[in-house]
Amino acid sequence: MECPYCQNTSSRVLESRSTEAGQSIRRRRECLQCKHRFTTYERIEFVPISVLKKDKSKESFDRSKLLRGIVRACEKTEVSAQQIENVVEEIEARLQQSPRREITSQEIGQLVLQYLRELNEVAYIRFASVYGEFKGITDFVETLNQLQQEERESSSSPEWSDAGEEATVIEDSSQVMASS
């Protein structure tokens, strides 16, 4: 590592720490010649991902573009900057773990929607309206109705169905006892 002060290539590591959720290592170094201290960061170099857009053009995956879109959707909600950063990191990690080096913008949009759906419904609707190119109020109403339907389906308590099964078992055993 070259010293930023004297350009000497000999330095020693004084301290190493994991940063950014284990995505990089921060190293505190000391130049062996001039004795100045400086910090370096070591990151994993990812293979670039190409994004295939709707118009069939390609561009390199841009993390900051993803972050901007999610920040915009989460404005004036209770979603914290750390939660947004976590979502971006998780999406980026999923893209990097994929064996494919080319992904469509629609696939990225669907990933964002999955995370925002769990994080905040308002942010989900905002992102969906831009991503889905809503043309009018009908598109919003359809999406809201779909959210409400999913909410109703997921709110059916498993305890309720268990209680129903127990009641059936009790009825069956009482019938057996009555017939004995």
From Swiss-Prot:
GO biological process terms on file: negative regulation of DNA-templated transcription
InterPro entries in UniProt: ATP-cone_dom, NrdR-like_N, RNR_NrdR-like
Keywords: ATP-binding, DNA-binding, Metal-binding, Nucleotide-binding, Repressor, Transcription, Transcription regulation, Zinc, Zinc-finger
Co-factor remark: Binds 1 zinc ion.
Pfam family, one: Zn_ribbon_NrdR
Molecular function GO terms recorded: ATP binding; DNA binding; zinc ion binding
ZnF unnamed span: 3-34
Positions of the UniProt region annotated as Disordered: 148-180
Cofactor: Zn(2+)
Skewed-composition ranges (Polar residues): 171-180
Positions of the ATP-cone domain: 49-139
Protein's job: Negatively regulates transcription of bacterial ribonucleotide reductase nrd genes and operons by binding to NrdR-boxes.
Protein family per UniProt: Belongs to the NrdR family.
The protein's name: Transcriptional repressor NrdR
Organism ancestry: Bacteria, Bacillati, Cyanobacteriota, Cyanophyceae, Oscillatoriophycideae
